[in-house]
């Protein structure tokens, strides 16, 4: 007589609760170790993008100055005028003038407009900074007094990086970049590119050299040129 035999199913060998907790703990540790490095790599890449853009801005400002003879944007009558906002959407701002074509009707041909040979810059959009930040501006205004203390907000730069006091002549016309929405890590990455070796502590690095940083409002102020 034939007999039928059925093997019982083996129970699957899964993780125990203790083993699962151990695996999750290891994953959490790996994430904790890797995330800062990932963020640093991203910040480093973005900082390099902004550093490259800065060279373009410097060249544009220098060429504008060579033609027009001023760092201030020209007003409608062709007279240089300080403009503290630096928003590209403002037609009288420096970035708006740098991207203006010489054949544009905004070029009235009056006074120093006859020397204008723009565009000097292909694009500058306040709402889309290259690499770092949420918004950027390019003001053109007067510098603080020579030798006055540099702060995280004033129009002064310790370009030599030696004493925390402004090296710019009193009242000099200054073109600079203000970038909002920058983290401490992002500032450090850009500062390491632009101002490598300047400052022996965090406070000095934030206030000396071409790149200043105000951690209170996450803003960078980057010197471009002065006259």
Predicted regions and their residues:
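Short, glycine/small-hydrophobic-rich surface segments
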Residues: 61-118
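Structured segments of extracytoplasmic/periplasmic soluble domains
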Residues: 60-68, 101, 119, 123-127, ...
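N-terminal leader/signal peptides at the extreme start of proteins
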Residues: 1-15
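Short, surface-exposed interaction loops/tails
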Residues: 149-227
